[in-house]
């Protein structure tokens, strides 16, 4: 059975006398998604600040490999902003949490989820890197910076189950970190 919890760092009453975390809830009785709120106030810079720099960098190129895209990110400083929620999600081993943008985000605020949707695996919960804190990767397409206030709704999550193929070799690798830790780094 799935359960939302506050990550440990926000349980420190000396640092956070009043816990800033709002646990996700469904807005209506038939809503599939649980609304997530920002646990901190976060500035999301406008993507447009670096567009001219990006155009100059890309002028003579037509296609990019992933390492080149990493170079573009380092050169221009253009990258998504992680907005923390202060929430972790305990899931059964055959479940995952799909996080998506709220439908109003692009229309009202010019904000989009950088990866369209995020997949939170059951073994992300409580990892030693970030205690399983769920963050949303947002990109600001507005002409100016946007500030997300603590408590603002920033996305939604839908708990889903999955199945595996019957002839899969047993996977014994275990998660060793948090955000992005399952990337293959040969």
Where are these regions (language model features)?
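DUTPase catalytic domain/fold
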Residues: 1-186
